[in-house]
Amino acid sequence: MKINPTTSVPGVSTLEKENLGRISQIIGPVLDVAFPPGKMPNIYNALVVKGQDTAGQQINVTCEVQQLLGNNRVRAVAMSATDGLTRGMEVIDTGAALSVPVGGATLGRIFNVLGEPVDNLGPVDTRTTSPIHKSAPAFIQLDTKLSIFETGIKVVDLLAPYRRGGKIGLFGGAGVGKTVLIMELINNIAKAHGGVSVFGGVGERTREGNDLYMEMKESGVINEQNLAESKVALVYGQMNEPPGARMRVGLTALTMAEYFRDVNEQDVLLFIDNIFRFVQAGSEVSALLGRMPSAVGYQPTLSTEMGTLQERITSTKEGSITSIQAVYVPADDLTDPAPATTFAHLDATTVLSRGLAAKGIYPAVDPLDSTSTMLQPRIVGEEHYETAQRVKQTLQRYKELQDIIAILGLDELSEEDRLTVARARKIERFLSQPFFVAEVFTGSPGKYVGLAETIRGFKLILSGELDGLPEQAFYLVGNIDEATAKATNLEMESKLKK
């Protein structure tokens, strides 16, 4: 692994003063820079513009070389606003790609695309940096063994299990519990797998990034008193930033995650919110660089850009990066090139349902819409597969009967269908679960449920052994023993009331 010493300019590995160019043209976030003959920088080299604008304000803009134009000129994309830059300003070629801080010192901190801390907590205490552009791991380094990544969340582990080192698409609108689910996964990987997480906020709202940070501090995912005890590093490139920053912030987050995997040999969770904004930023940059657009106005290099990012997210013999990517679907059109290209890389999808959230069933993961390539008997075993299929069949039958129930009522159903409905309602409630990170809001302690316990619980409901228990006993509990204990308590309470 290539480690570069940090320098006075964060995000830049080495400053070679002798290789200087001058700005010849500025078009928004794109700069053309002329260099002396024979001193041309390489593609992806970081360029730094330092100086003063006409008002005497200090300027420090980092750019990345994207094209070599001929006549000793290069075209570069700025990672921050180009306000105040003028033609003729001096540009330093750093001789290397953008480098960002990596390692344990990044935990509990918020960074921008250049790896500069933006949380007002002082400089990052690390001398270890790593370039954001790297090759994907070689074939011989990959771990090809198929294994389940246990999350401790019943609905996910049973019906749409995650693959260790896989990629998961997270679909859901506003206010259905995406953030809480993300925070619970961060909490559980730290407790159950001894792993850490990196959150890449790509082109989303600054307010959402701030809310996430505040909620993480409140729930203990970020420990303000002792940052080293934190479980996550945050990298933000929000929607008000130039397209260059939004296009590269995903790579900055990935580089931090790769260090935890390759050097610390940990299991890492990498969250990308939102993968669509990564494509959108690439589309803007592509147009600014003068490339001919492809279908629906996207960049012609869409598949290559997506593949370059996704192929670095994988399991190696040292550790794994499991990635959970929020996917915005423009105009709900799944055939749009951006989501369609993303789907090709996903191993599982977790779909959050507003209907379930309205019923108060959290996590509001839709058990029928969520899918996983891991749910096969040869991978998860016959018992798990059979239980999952029977749960889905029961819920599907309940869904089909809901119209009849709404019009005619439960009494008009056959005995068999009434039993199916009763069990489906118990299953629906048993798929809910109290979260550790929601403890501070709800007051009920969080529960981590192992896969074996999850399967045992659903098998007991399906077998009919628990038909006599009230359905509210299954709501917001951990394993099945808690449900039976809750049923006993409810019975005692009702007797006392009488």
Swiss-Prot record:
Membrane topology recorded in Swiss-Prot or TrEMBL: Peripheral membrane protein
UniProt-listed InterPro entries: AAA+_ATPase, ATP-synt_VA_C, ATP_synth_F1_bsu, ATPase_a/bsu_AS, ATPase_alpha/beta_chains, ATPase_F1/V1/A1_a/bsu_N, ATPase_F1/V1/A1_a/bsu_N_sf, ATPase_F1/V1/A1_a/bsu_nucl-bd
EC nos: 7.1.2.2
Chief place of localization: plastid
The keyword Secreted is annotated on this UniProt entry: no
Keyword Plastid among UniProt keywords: yes
Subcellular location: Plastid, Chloroplast thylakoid membrane
Keywords assigned: ATP synthesis, ATP-binding, CF(1), Chloroplast, Hydrogen ion transport, Ion transport, Membrane, Nucleotide-binding, Plastid, Thylakoid, Translocase, Transport
UniProt enzyme class: translocase
Residues given in the record as ATP binding sites: 172-179
SUPFAM superfamilies tied to this protein: C-terminal domain of alpha and beta subunits of F1 ATP synthase, N-terminal domain of alpha and beta subunits of F1 ATP synthase, P-loop containing nucleoside triphosphate hydrolases
Gene3D superfamilies: 2.40.10.170, Bovine Mitochondrial F1-atpase, Atp Synthase Beta Chain, Chain D, domain 3 (1.10.1140.10), P-loop containing nucleotide triphosphate hydrolases (3.40.50.300)
Gene Ontology annotations for the cellular component aspect, listed alphabetically: chloroplast thylakoid membrane; mitochondrion; proton-transporting ATP synthase complex
One Gene Ontology molecular-function label: ATP hydrolysis activity
Reaction catalysed by this enzyme: ATP + H2O + 4 H(+)(in) = ADP + phosphate + 5 H(+)(out)
Single biological process term from Gene Ontology: proton motive force-driven mitochondrial ATP synthesis
Its job: Produces ATP from ADP in the presence of a proton gradient across the membrane. The catalytic sites are hosted primarily by the beta subunits.
PANTHER family linked to this entry: ATP SYNTHASE, ATP SYNTHASE SUBUNIT BETA, MITOCHONDRIAL
Record HAMAP family: ATP_synth_beta_bact
Family from the record: Belongs to the ATPase alpha/beta chains family.
Subunit structure and binding partners: F-type ATPases have 2 components, CF(1) - the catalytic core - and CF(0) - the membrane proton channel. CF(1) has five subunits: alpha(3), beta(3), gamma(1), delta(1), epsilon(1). CF(0) has four main subunits: a(1), b(1), b'(1) and c(9-12).
Protein name: ATP synthase subunit beta, chloroplastic
